[in-house]
């Protein structure tokens, strides 16, 4: 999952992913939309493929890219869990975190 976080940290890759939300795209379409050269696009697509965020399928002379929505669902679940879970309000999580921090500070002072 770490590769996915690194991949989406880059604004060009996020732009590519956003464009792929509209459906399958060829490498040429992606390069034009992202306003990057073929070499830079190749690098970005490799990072996205290694993170398993996009799928690629060869169709004749073209490579067609699409989103791997399963990985995005896993990322969303992981982030939701990290932020405090689906059934827990964020306000409650923040209060609990502050209570733990305060408790640790009191223990350190003793």
Question: Residue ranges of each PLM-predicted region?
Answer:
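Single-residue recognition of alpha-helix boundary sites
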Residues: 24, 55, 79-80
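Short, hydrophobic-biased segments on the C-terminal half of alpha helices
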Residues: 45-46
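N-terminal helix-turn-helix DNA-binding core of bacterial DNA-binding proteins
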Residues: 2-40, 61-72
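Extended rod-forming repeat segments used as scaffolds/tethers
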Residues: 17, 50-51, 104
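Beta-hairpin "wing" of winged helix-turn-helix
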Residues: 49-59, 66
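Amphipathic alpha-helical dimerization/coiled-coil segments
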Residues: 69, 73-110
């Amino acid at each position: 999952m770490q590769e996915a976080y690194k991949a989406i940290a880059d604004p060009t890759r996020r732009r590519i992913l956003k464009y792929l939300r509209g459906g399958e795209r060829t490498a040429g379409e992606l390069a034009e939309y992202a306003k990057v050269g073929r070499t830079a696009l190749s690098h970005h697509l490799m990072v996205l493929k290694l993170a398993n965020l996009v799928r690629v399928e060869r169709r004749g002379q073209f490579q067609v890219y699409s989103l791997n929505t399963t990985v995005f669902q896993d990322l969303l679940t992981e982030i939701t869990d990290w932020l405090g879970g689906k059934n827990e309000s964020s306000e409650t999580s923040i209060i609990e975190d502050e209570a733990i921090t305060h408790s640790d500070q009191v223990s350190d002072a003793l």
